[in-house]
Design a protein with these regions (language model features):
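Short, membrane-interfacial amphipathic segments enriched in basic
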Residues: 20-64, 241-242, 246
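Active-site cofactor/substrate anionic-group-binding motifs, chiefly glycine-
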Residues: 69-125
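Selective transmembrane-helix segments that form parts of the transport pathway or gating/packing helices
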Residues: 74, 78, 82, 121, ...
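Generic alpha-helical transmembrane segments of integral inner-membrane proteins
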Residues: 83-90, 174, 178, 182, ...
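Membrane-interfacial helix-loop-helix connectors in multipass membrane proteins
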Residues: 95-119, 186-228, 236-258, 278-283
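Hydrophobic alpha-helical transmembrane segments of multi-pass membrane transport proteins
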Residues: 109-152, 237
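Short cytoplasmic-facing helical segments at TM-TM junctions of multi-pass membrane proteins
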Residues: 142-167, 249-252
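Hydrophobic alpha-helical transmembrane segments of integral membrane proteins
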Residues: 163, 167-170, 262-282
Length: 283
């Protein structure tokens, strides 16, 4: 495996002796050690991202592998995202009905459900669900390839592992997350309407027209496409944790776990920032 100072193009950076990917439990002897470990990890992540971008824009492009990742990340995540979205829609509908009825604002119920699902619960639930499923899968898969030296073999065969393994998965995450979010939103709104229709007569047309009354593209598109940033975070961290793991089978488990925990954490933090930016630029 090439060292970070090697001039070999596309080489995977090997951790220095005793250095490993940022663990889930950051147990260190001092706060200074914690801070230095985090910034070292974050710097390595930035270098990894630059190497992936450079490989992604350099031919040849791995179209076949990208399409395979579309299916793996998008199609196979759809049932779980749909189920989570539907459950969220039902719970939100019941809670919103109870709260708005207490304040005499039951007429605003469809709009409250629509805006809550599209603006926040749909995107963040989709991001966390995909982070759990896809993050663990990518982290474990690439970590297994690393400890069994398959990545070394790919590099030895003159194939850039950043392009074949990382860029395709990250790009698939970026492109699939908005589509999965739309599917999750649709399921959430549909089940939100069902939950209301079981309580009082309310047609789907009435629910949609009342819920989307006054809505604009500024209300709909930015919250949906912020999940592309979630996709970047999930794919980048999962690939990074997987491709730099070490320690045999135990390392594979640590890579999978840390991929899920770290990507979920950064998705939540990114959501806070993106919500504020959306409110500033799309009031």
């Amino acid at each position: 495996m090439t060292d970070v100072n090697s001039a070999a193009v596309g080489g995977i950076r090997s951790p220095s002796p005793g250095h490993r990917a940022l663990p889930v439990s950051l147990t260190v002897n001092s706060s200074k050690g914690l801070v230095s470990e985090f910034f070292e990890w974050f710097g390595d992540l930035g270098i990894f991202f630059w190497q992936v971008v450079r490989a992604a824009v350099t031919p040849p492009f791995e179209i076949r592998e990208l399409v395979r990742q579309f299916d793996e990340i998008g199609s196979k995540s759809l049932p779980l995202v749909a189920l989570a979205g539907a459950a969220t829609g039902v719970v939100l509908s019941l809670e919103a009905r109870y709260s708005l009825t207490r304040f005499g604002a039951k007429s605003l119920l469809p709009a409250a459900i629509v805006f809550s699902v599209i603006h926040e619960t749909g995107p963040i639930i989709t991001g966390l669900v995909v982070s759990g499923r896809v993050g663990a899968g990518i982290g474990a898969e690439l970590a297994s390839m690393k400890v069994t030296e398959q990545i070394d073999a790919i590099e030895a065969s003159a194939v850039n592992p950043y392009r074949l393994l990382a860029a395709t998965r990250i790009l698939a995450c970026i492109l699939m997350l908005p589509l999965l979010t739309l599917a999750g939103d649709a399921c959430g709104l549909l089940m939100g309407w069902v939950a209301q229709a079981l309580v009082e007569p309310l047609s789907l047309h009435q629910f949609i027209s009342s819920g989307f009354n006054g809505a604009s593209f500024n209300d709909l598109l930015p919250p949906t496409f912020k999940t592309a940033v979630f996709g970047l975070i999930i794919g980048l961290i999962a690939c990074f944790q997987g491709m730099r793991t070490q320690g045999g089978a135990a390392g594979v488990g640590r890579a999978a776990t840390s991929s899920v925990v770290l990507s979920s954490l950064f998705v939540i933090l990114a959501d806070v920032v993106l919500v504020k930016l959306i409110l500033i630029f799309f009031p």
